[in-house]
Amino acid sequence: MSTAAIPTDAAVQAAIAEARARLADGSMRIRMAYEGHPATSTVLKGRAHLVDETIHRLWRACAMPADVALLAVGGYGRGELFPCSDVDLMVLLPDTADDAMQARLSVLLGALWDVGLEIGHSARTVAEAIDAAEQDITVQTNLLESRLLEGNRPLFEEFCRRYRALLDVRVFFKAKQLEQEKRYARYNDTPYALEPNCKESPGGLRDLQMLGWIARAAGLGRNWRDLARRRLITGAEARDLRSIERFLQHVRIRLHYLTGRSEDRLLFDYQERLASALGIEATAAKRASEVFMQRYYVNAKKVTQTNTILLQNYGVEIFPRRAGAAIVINERFQAVRELLDMREDDTFARHPSALLECFLILQQRSELKGMTARTLRALWLNRKRINAAFRADPHNRELFVAILQQKRGIVHEFRRMNQYGILSGYLPSWRRIVGQMQHDLFHVYTVDQHIMMVLRNMRRFTMGEHAHEYPLMAQLIMAFDRHWLLYVAALFHDIAKGRGGDHSKLGTIDAREFCEHHHLAREDADLVVWLVEHHLTMSHVAQKEDTSDPAVIGRFADTVGTERRLTALYLLTHADIRGTSPKVWNGWKGKLLEDLFFATRRLLRGATPQEALGLDDRQENARALLRYHGLRPGVEDALWAQLDAVYFMRHSAEEIAWHSRTLYYRPDALEPVVKARVSDADQGVQVMVFTRDQKDLFVRLTGFFGRLGFSILDAKVHTTRHGYALDSFMLQDPGNAEHYRDVITLIEHELTERLKKSAPPDRPSAGRLSRQVKHFPITPRVSILPDESGRHYILSLTAADRRGLLFAVAEVLAQNGIVLHTAKIATLGERVEDTFLLSGNGLSQDARVVKIERELLQRLHI
């Protein structure tokens, strides 16, 4: 390596100071120019040029050897830099770096960091660079657009020759396809998340970049116009892509400026300000952020459409093979290279019904892997042929029902129909929910994508490969005659979202109209409409009402009416909750629904309310479990004599046996007994507390759990006949299951000691509100109403979830002398909807109730 005089530290520091000032001044000028006249090139090209100049100065100031080459790689190599993007560099060495060279590189890289650049770098010989590219597709991609910044041009040209020799376009194409599939999977295969990543999510900038990389690697072109000239896309598609690319670039530029960092997620916190920065205004019906996000979704959808078409066309270019004879399917379609192809360019114009028929053919012919690019393009361009006359055509109605009735491909084809605008054409109500955001803080998808997730879940219940995940669901749906009706209910259950009013009621109008137009039998139509109207009922009863109360089960059974309706509603409810967000479903909710399902089914099959709840069976099964654990008959009698029927109704046989094993020999325990275990739902920890009843006990228990950071999923408060509290809690640990043994030990020891000492209640910290709640605040609601028996009162509250919330409620109730019997905690993402069964003097007095409600609201407001 050549040796040049190493500059003095003072000279380097002076160069750094000057470069830092120039970079800051240049960055400010670029931003001002962009704000004055927003053009993406002002930032992307301008910042890349500014960084080029900075690097040139520092390279010279550090007197780097002439035989070394400095390359810009990645996006910077392409000559584009977003405001806060990393600057990716590769130092190309003629030989392995010695100590002197390492020292010079350290000075240069240190200088680049000191001026304020975020540097990503590597230092390699040509052989090392080629080897790294062979081993890692990410490195290979990064080097695809490399350009020489400084230094040894012959060395750079040697690297370019060897890189081109290495590049196998076929391998590169397949690797990038696989990479995209994995990336899509990380984002649940949808661009319609409520907080998408504008760079990495499906339909984001990365999709466009990937199309560019493959085109460049295959020599197909360097921009969208080149691809249009090669007829890989149309001129209109090229213009659309450039327009969409600019939109996404504007979004990312604004996001970087707004956050001051390389942030690519469109978080709720930023959406309103981004809309303002982009000049997007609110409408009478939608806030500016919603208008902005719908525009984002429309553009992301177009990107994914064109991505599919272009990748297919790339494949034809990269893997040329003799076109085999097309296999004729019917007058309208043929199979070409395992893809469905229209036989004539005007197929959809001459045969509009083919707009639905093509999806049915894909379902019926498993050898077909998709549609040809020209068919997909024509599908999109002809989507508006689906009009009132099309929808009224009996043949088209038969085709749509046939698609729903197929044994395979239902989810794939409905997603494709949604992607290409066919579903919006055929179901006019669907248009209103495409890209519609949901600000309820537990749905993480737009309305149309949530429905697709529910449809997917329902479909999975029927598939053998998923039976181990949902064994009961699989058993029920396979015994359910005409289960395609459940798919219809799934399609319509949320179709009236966002119209104002009760979407469950409004949706029945659309569902009834669909059923009548498609000639569903009266019984089937009634089932679909009933499911749409009641799709929230089972979730409400299971999570908010006392399902150990025979009256609650009786009312729910009256609402359901038949076992067929019950089964259908159970399947839809399960699929619906799982389709809201990966975080909303848990095993505890599954158990609540399952218990309600079986109790109601027994009642519908003729059991008495007591038999339906399994009270006698529960005691018998609990005794059997005690015998199984080696306890002799009758040891439980002393304890059970102190427990009333309410206790046995509210606990499962397994819980009763667990309590009994722990307490049978000490029903008059002098000291508190605390036992904990991992729940059988594998979702947290069950805790049992047995101690002499005392004032503020529930407040102390909730304070203790709140201080440890546990969420209380369920609480059952019981007082025995001899004055002991036997309280049960289901807790969700904010950590993970790996340390449950330590958690159980901590709870049993520390809580026992605190109860022994009659220590004052722990005051859990209020906890911080999530950013979602800050952006979409939840107005607390509280109501206290008598139950139907007139013996108890039901407190219902809705509020933003936070640590210590249940403690605050318990404290207000205790201060007012109110006795709490059960607590049902329904956590829906960032929102809680809790229900408490109460009793106490004064609850029959309106003034007293108003006072308690006011105090609760004061504690719930943050």
From Swiss-Prot:
SUPFAM superfamilies reported for this sequence: ACT-like, HD-domain/PDEase-like, Nucleotidyltransferase, Nucleotidyltransferase substrate binding subunit/domain
One annotated GO molecular function: [protein-PII] uridylyltransferase activity
Keyword Hydrolase among record annotations: yes
InterPro entries: ACT-like_dom_sf (IPR045865), ACT_dom (IPR002912), HD/PDEase_dom (IPR003607), HD_domain (IPR006674), NT_sf (IPR043519), PII_UdlTrfase/GS_AdlTrfase (IPR013546), UTase/UR (IPR010043)
Necessary cofactors: Mg(2+)
Catalysis performed (reactions): [protein-PII]-L-tyrosine + UTP = [protein-PII]-uridylyl-L-tyrosine + diphosphate; [protein-PII]-uridylyl-L-tyrosine + H2O = [protein-PII]-L-tyrosine + UMP + H(+)
Functional summary from the UniProt entry: Modifies, by uridylylation and deuridylylation, the PII regulatory proteins (GlnB and homologs), in response to the nitrogen status of the cell that GlnD senses through the glutamine level. Under low glutamine levels, catalyzes the conversion of the PII proteins and UTP to PII-UMP and PPi, while under higher glutamine levels, GlnD hydrolyzes PII-UMP to PII and UMP (deuridylylation). Thus, controls uridylylation state and activity of the PII proteins, and plays an important role in the regulation of nitrogen assimilation and metabolism.
Name of the featured protein: Bifunctional uridylyltransferase/uridylyl-removing enzyme
Organism from which the protein derives: Aromatoleum aromaticum (strain DSM 19018 / LMG 30748 / EbN1) (Azoarcus sp. (strain EbN1))
